């Protein structure tokens, strides 16, 4: 089993930890707990770069090795990094589990060394009709991020 972790941070008081586990060539299980967000849905994506020198802005676009349009996690046409939304409760906390087959922890399309980004707004899953829907899900600003690192 391969394990990875990201510690999310921000200048806006958002924090959290996200764990990734993958058994063999099976899907990757993502479990997380994020706090300090406003209640509601927030876009949750793997971005292409693990560069946080300019905060979350330098993490690049969504991880998209196949060159597809943005979509929902269950869509055939989607960026590999499109993990949809996390749901934040009235207490400002989101606890979630996602199982996804397009974010491996090993191999040429590994997400290790890339960044996880939590966005300010809901991801419209490419269906919102906004000019940014097919690129970013119109999920708004980047409120927290961190680099995915291997765990022992």
From Swiss-Prot:
First-tier enzyme category under EC: oxidoreductase
InterPro entries with a match to the protein in the record: SOD-like_Cu/Zn_dom_sf (IPR036423), SOD_Cu/Zn_/chaperone (IPR024134), SOD_Cu/Zn_BS (IPR018152), SOD_Cu_Zn_dom (IPR001424)
Disulfide feature: 56-145
Subcellular location(s) of the protein: Cytoplasm
Enzyme Commission number(s): 1.15.1.1
Summary of subunit composition and partner proteins: Homodimer.
Family label: Belongs to the Cu-Zn superoxide dismutase family.
Name recorded for this polypeptide: Superoxide dismutase [Cu-Zn] 1
Organism whose genome encodes this protein: Mesembryanthemum crystallinum (Common ice plant)
Gene giving rise to this polypeptide: SODCC.1
